[in-house]
Amino acid sequence: MEDLVCVGITHKEAEVEELEKARFESDEAVRDIVESFGLSGCVLLQTCNRVEVYASGARDRAEELGDLIHDDAWVKRGSEAVRHLFRVACGLESMMVGEQEILRQVKKAYDRAARLGTLDEALKIVFRRAINLGKRAREETRISEGAVSIGSAAVELAERELGSLHDKTVLVVGAGEMGKTVAKSLVDRGVRAVLVANRTYERAVELARDLGGEAVRFDELVDHLARSDVVVSATAAPHPVIHVDDVREALRKRDRRSPILIIDIANPRDVEEGVENIEDVEVRTIDDLRVIARENLERRRKEIPKVEKLIEEELSTVEEELEKLKERRLVADVAKSLHEIKDRELERALRRLKTGDPENVLQDFAEAYTKRLINVLTSAIMELPDEYRRAACRALRRASELNG
């Protein structure tokens, strides 16, 4: 495990502008990193909030690798690098604790490295473990429950007030970023239809296209209020654009008796004072959404110790798995060395067989091969630390007893 390193910079250490500068132009830069640093394997994880390189075989060049990203890049080695990856996959290192998207991004980074051929066995093990752990953390704890963004809070609020949104129509008033964010979250939840109204009709058309909805005329707002179940208002107007009389008239025009939920996220407010007093109308503001998001985020934070326990348990398991991988590699390396010794001695013996006595040649071959084996094994054992040397000697003793 000590051969694994992680270097990076995240939203915790840098502003958005710095993170943008740290980003590699192409996610396929991972190939260049492997070649430049002579790595065994490499995975590049780039998101809005982090630029991280996970590498195998970079222990002696970790700082150089960090400098490739940013002057202030941190370096984590061995178990700390693996623990960090596990925390990332579980959403503990995200700006919004427990968010789902990061797990998809980790899997995407892993799949890309696999496609580009930059995964070695060690990275395969830790990334597969991280992805599975990320799923378990969300299934076995409540780390991802509840809305923590303004958009998802709007969905939660709408479902609290109206139940399922699948048969609901959403009206977006204003074409600004905040309104678009909230509306997109509602659309992703599967609402029946989306209407977009804006004073500049062309902007309404543009946003409607992005949302897969219908652009409507701002001066026909009352008619469209009558069609809607959820209204998201987010204009930049200096005065209210949804008036008491408009809402009353819209209710009269409705062909059904059902509530209207108006989410006013404009500053100053888009909804005239008094609308909240109309029967069958619920008015909520961005403050209500923030309260929902804050409460849910606090609940998620209480789940962190449970997730950290899962991480430590998984870390012990992956350490054992990596140790076994290391042992398999060692056995393979020893076997390769012994085969090379055998091939050299055999080549020498075959040359001698052309002129020498076969029995003597074979006897010399066996003695030379045995002597070389003993020298290789003895030298390797004597270079080990005391506790490992004693264990190796015990293993050799058992092997000789079994052979006897």
Curated annotation (Swiss-Prot):
Protein purpose: Catalyzes the NADPH-dependent reduction of glutamyl-tRNA(Glu) to glutamate 1-semialdehyde (GSA). In the absence of NADPH, exhibits substrate esterase activity, leading to the release of glutamate from tRNA.
Species assigned in the record: Methanopyrus kandleri (strain AV19 / DSM 6324 / JCM 9639 / NBRC 100938)
HAMAP family in alphabetical order: Glu_tRNA_reductase
Protein name (record): Glutamyl-tRNA reductase
PROSITE patterns tied to this protein: GLUTR (PS00747)
Protein's gene: hemA
Temperature dependence: Optimum temperature is 90 degrees Celsius.
Catalytic residue positions: C48
Assembly description: Homotetramer.
